């Protein structure tokens, strides 16, 4: 606990050295000469202090590494673009969905808008009707989903489209910073840090070596009470596209999730909380673990209108310690256990969050290419059962978002305000998730 406290206090001290003049600009709006929806004009620069060796280029690639794990990022969206870990044969595999060319993430924003690998915010997931009420005041955020009827992932220009500043950089960690001066009509100013780090027990003469990737977002409300709910939006494929889909390859276990948030056809919460074992004949029951594809044909309509698959918020049931901002996943039972039959790669996820959103890539349709580097790696090794997967097909990946109960700000009866509403008088909003990889 002392180590956790020390690390978080250092982060908070770092906040104090960054004044509200530290602003971030939106890259694709600068390219197009447009204006963000908060009415300010992007100026193509940032007054945040850059880390030594860092660049103001939003598409500059940064790589951190430890023994048998390598992660690469770009500042555009504080985005993870590659994560290399070993499979059961010791071959390094990229288990992240995305693009090889950083420029393609900008193109994606303007076309598919997949949110590959980015940090979403200021408020992840959906806001019903793009509106919420705080202390009697109604706030309206840009409606950017379903014919502009609701808000998704923070609005039209969310954190995924901002150029975060690299404010700390080492061989095994990187920190991005974003000052949000009322973006997308959210109240008040918020300073955000996200630190990614890697660790490894390979080479330490320990049994069952493992690698570890950690994402920590720390956000402070500086001026007003406001919703804050950031989340890493990482698309995973633990079989590294050796198979067209994850349906018969990937096992998913959610041992702490016996409940889920019921949603309507727009994926907006109805206010009801369902039981995974008694609802929908157990289609959403992953408490004991099963293949993604085992019950997916029965998952008709639970991921929205005219949709078959998963796009659901699973509640993490455990003694509640998320209000303690010193809590860390190292003290917690894993909330996710996922593994690939093909590669033998296993991933355990621990988090201090209240819920996990699982999305089975229902909307992919083969129009987005698999990274050329992943295709080349599979060709070179002869993997893929004689076939080469070069397009991201439906159910070709899985998104895991560590976050709070979705749209909790519009469901006060749930009692989630302490974990989603923050003010200058409150502690920081912290999303801490650790992904541990082994292979067998």
Swiss-Prot record:
One of its GO terms (biological process) is galactose catabolic process via UDP-galactose, Leloir pathway. Transmembrane segments: none annotated. Its EC number is 5.1.3.3. Keywords: Carbohydrate metabolism, Glycoprotein, Isomerase, Secreted, Signal. It catalyses: alpha-D-glucose = beta-D-glucose. CDD domains: galactose_mutarotase_like (cd09019). One of its GO terms (cellular component) is extracellular region. It is found in: Secreted. GO terms for molecular function: aldose 1-epimerase activity; carbohydrate binding. Residues 1-24 form the signal peptide. It comes from the Eukaryota. Pfam families: Aldose_epim. Substrate binds at residues 125-126, 311. Glycans are attached at residues 32, 38, 43, 68, 112, 129, 147, 163, 171, 199, 243, 275, 281, 306, 321, 337, 365, 385. Pathway: Carbohydrate metabolism; hexose metabolism. The active site is at residues 233, 401. SUPFAM superfamilies: Galactose mutarotase-like. Monomer. Belongs to the aldose epimerase family. Mutarotase converts alpha-aldose to the beta-anomer. It is active on D-glucose, L-arabinose, D-xylose, D-galactose, maltose and lactose. This is Probable aldose 1-epimerase ARB_05372. It comes from Arthroderma benhamiae (strain ATCC MYA-4681 / CBS 112371). The lineage of its organism: Eukaryota, Fungi, Dikarya, Ascomycota, Pezizomycotina.
